[in-house]
Amino acid sequence: MSRRKRNVKTDTVDVRKLSRLLAREHEGEDVFRVVRVPPEEAEVERLLPRQLKALKKQRTRITNRIQARLFAEGVVLDPRGGSFRAQTFLKELSQALRWDGSPLPAGLVYMVRQDWAQYCLVEEQIRDLAQRQRRALRRAREGDPEATPAQRKAALLTELRGIGDVGAYVLTTELFGWRVFNNRKEVGAIAGLTGTPSTSGNGGREQGISKAGNARVRTLMVELAWLWLRYQPESRTSKWFRDQIGKAGSRGKRRAIVAVARKLLVELWHFVEHGVVPDGATFKPENAGLAQRVA
């Protein structure tokens, strides 16, 4: 069938199709998927980490734009080297010279100053949101009765080594704070980390992960998986990773780290919902006594 085929699309056609589906559902066929709508409070709570991530992406774009404008003239200002500090950037910009020793064009300096003003504004907004997030988690750790379920679970996750405030808050606001999972398969599927088999007759192959779930959680879990291997080397999941890769190359490691991300997500779900500490995991030094309280 041609992919460019033009299909009829009218309200009448849609209503007839919907009525047939409803009739099949009434007869007991499984033709609809249940959509779990988050409560209004959970929707609002997700805005903070999402906005924080969006601002960080915007900051990166502005940084790259400033560096590109200056690099074209032979000027290198690296934010990782401390050049993007508010106290020194404008001073270094005024003293910068082109590759041939001549002053920077006035129009270029003006545009860079405009970009710098945007950078400072975004940086201030990031600090404000990060402080709000830290205050919310601090209140949850102190047992504030007004703390939301997502905040309390995020505070619990941060007790584990390798799990920071940002990652814990995203996990709980996107998943653990309001969603209900019946089994580990649902947990892996919601992040799109489960496999996609393709079989026919006696033949079959694995097509990789489905990538059909929450992209934010999927990306975060891969990052957390690498951190988990670093800060939790004696955990069962980390040992499994080392046993699997052996002398594997980068491709084998990439495939194995996705499996670690899936396993870790399930373990964190068991931890926040059932109090089961991941096998071999350790707590941060200031929370070493939490293992007995959670178990």
Would you name each region that the model predicts?
Residues 4, 33-51, 107, 204-211, ...:
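Short, solvent-exposed helix-loop connector elements
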Residues 45-156, 285, 290-291:
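Glycine-rich, often acidic, oxyanion-interacting loops/wings at catalytic, nucleic-acid
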Residues 26-30, 62-63, 126-129, 177-180, ...:
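Short helix-capping/linker segments at secondary-structure and domain boundaries
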Residues 152-253, 290:
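Phosphate-backbone recognition surface of nucleic-acid-processing proteins
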Residues 202-206, 241-295:
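Low-complexity, acidic/Ser/Thr- and charged residue-rich accessory regions of DNA metabolism proteins
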Residues 1-34, 84, 88-93, 201-212, ...:
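Short alpha-helix plus adjacent loop in nuclease-associated cores
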Residues 17, 21, 25-66:
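Extended, highly charged alpha-helical segments
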